[in-house]
């Protein structure tokens, strides 16, 4: 987390402090923040990932290097633990479908199999609201919403399959839960905000649609908080077992108003150019076809999924998380932006 855990919060995760915990994908944005929070709690935490993480090793955090698609490597990392946070995933909206399925679907199967064989009783899965995004506006939607029947990107398709199987595996011997944080941002972010800023600075970002769409966003500390609460629940009452939870800030934001306000703080030109959704969606369709036919690896500047995400509203009810997990955002949106701007100022080369 970007700020130390307070004593009052530590009491919210008292059962976790005595656990031996594995975090897959512990070198990523959410994963690393989760690892550091668990370390602050006093838990015995280890990491599994593709690379070595010298910064974590310097903190005496064991790092198991391996491929999530290697079932034996996953089993070795899981062995000896009694709680697993499965955060590792191939993110993004473009790339070979086979890679997304191998890493996100089969990789999750490997984690599930390892937890079963090693008798790990708790598995918390990092999912995404993209599993229910089915082209339409989502305003205050809750977890009763069905999975998307026609996902527009391999990432969403692979996460649907993984979440379905992990939740279906819930049983008295292995309690599972899925956390769906939306658009996670904050200090340490190497993807969402940096990409927005890069596109804004280059003039390649346009407002898609009429600019009125609202979205959920999630400050990093709040995403971590939700994961910790979920694990704590499974270790105690287990009322959350077998369920998924949407996670976000105290309320949704107008996407383009929020982006432009952030850009103003960062001295990035505001987004003023507008593109109709139909035009952006058509461009995405064409670019996807061209990139596929030419076997281009780089992400198209526009895709169908991206066009819809930029134009449609997608925000969710957090009532289930509030009722069963006791979730409330620790950091409000305005304070989160202040912390993000300060972090960017401290880490961006002059």
Describe each PLM feature range:
Residues 2-9, 20, 316-324, 328-350:
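Amphipathic terminal alpha-helices
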Residues 21-40:
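N-terminal Rossmann NAD(P)H-binding glycine-rich loop of SDR-like oxidoreductase domains
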Residues 55-57, 61, 65-106, 114, ...:
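NAD(P)H-binding glycine-rich loop region in Rossmannoid oxidoreductase-like domains
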Residues 110-154:
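Conserved Rossmann-fold NAD(P)-dependent oxidoreductase catalytic core, especially the SDR/UDP-sugar
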Residues 137-184, 205:
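Catalytic helix-loop patch of NAD(P)-dependent Rossmann-fold dehydrogenases
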Residues 161-162, 189-195, 210-232, 242-246:
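Substrate-positioning beta->alpha
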Residues 220, 244, 260, 283-292, ...:
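Conserved C-terminal active-site "lid" loop/helix of NAD(P)H-dependent oxidoreductases
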Residues 233-300, 338-341:
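Mid/C-terminal beta-alpha module of Rossmann-like enzyme folds, strongest
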